[in-house]
């Protein structure tokens, strides 16, 4: 039974929620467990690689959500209408973007950049102003690992507790940083199921979307796309996991 429970939670955490029941509040006990999970995840030599900002205030969550108009609508057919490459990076056409309702949730966790308790030689050197580009890159990668491990652990425990979860890494950094006061790296939303198709945007209707990307009638909620993951696993460098279960 415990294996099926874990697998069910994994399946929930893999598929993000696009709408939540905002009339409910997360209990203090559950919130404490979620925070404990996020801040006690494994990291290299137990260094501190991020600062965690937690928001339960609906007004602040709304402001965070307003920073996320970065979800791009495009197909290969309309690709050139959507993106433009510049020296400062790729710029997307705002007319083909929507806010990410994965994090218009009951509680929001924002992972922000932080460096503390550094113990490894490379990490200490990377934290100095004259560090090489390679050393800085390696340290940033380690910090990204820590955020990834923590957020994955957080999402899984949220699912075990019966909640739905969502992620957002595309947002306006300056706008969000004005709220968090630290450089934001990743947003995780956790909340209650809204008893509707998880892919439906909580606020955007098809009439708000360019015609070529509408998913139904004008008065229906616009539906996010969904994709399946294909991952090959080998056991001991040879046996195919799917056909040779241990």
Where would I find each of the regions flagged by the language model?
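N-terminal amphipathic, basic helical "cap/leader" segment at the start of enzyme domains
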Residues: 1-118, 222-246
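Small-aliphatic-rich amphipathic alpha-helix that forms the alpha element of a beta-alpha
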Residues: 34, 38-39, 109, 115-177
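Short glycine/serine/proline-enriched coil/turn segments at secondary-structure junctions
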Residues: 43-46, 157, 196
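Short secondary-structure junction motifs
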Residues: 47-50, 163, 185
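A glycine-rich helix N-cap at a beta->alpha junction
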Residues: 73-84, 180-207
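Generic beta-strand structural signal
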Residues: 105-107, 161, 184-188
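Alpha-helical transmembrane segments and their immediate juxtamembrane flanks
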Residues: 200-226
């Amino acid at each position: 039974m415990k294996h099926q429970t874990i697998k069910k939670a994994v399946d929930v955490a893999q598929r993000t929620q696009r709408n939540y029941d905002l009339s409910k509040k997360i209990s203090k006990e559950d919130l404490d467990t979620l925070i404990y999970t996020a801040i006690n995840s494994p990291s290299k030599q137990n260094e501190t690689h991020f600062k965690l900002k937690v928001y339960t205030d609906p007004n602040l969550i709304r402001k965070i959500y307003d920073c996320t108009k970065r979800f791009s609508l495009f197909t290969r057919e309309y690709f050139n209408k959507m993106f433009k490459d510049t020296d400062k990076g790729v710029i997307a056409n705002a007319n083909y973007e929507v806010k990410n309702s994965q994090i218009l949730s009951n509680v929001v966790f924002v992972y922000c950049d932080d460096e503390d308790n550094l113990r490894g030689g490379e990490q200490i050197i990377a934290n100095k102003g004259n560090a090489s580009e390679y050393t800085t890159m390696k340290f940033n990668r380690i910090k990204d690992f820590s955020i990834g491990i923590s957020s994955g652990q957080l999402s899984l425990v949220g699912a075990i507790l019966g909640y739905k979860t969502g992620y957002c890494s595309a947002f306006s950094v300056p706008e969000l940083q004005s709220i968090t006061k630290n450089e934001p790296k990743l947003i995780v939303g956790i909340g209650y199921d809204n008893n509707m198709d998880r892919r439906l945007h909580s606020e955007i209707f098809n009439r708000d979307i360019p015609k070529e990307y509408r998913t139904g009638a004008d008065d229906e909620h616009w539906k996010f796309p969904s994709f399946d993951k294909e991952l090959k696993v080998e056991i001991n460098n040879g046996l195919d996991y799917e056909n040779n279960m241990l």
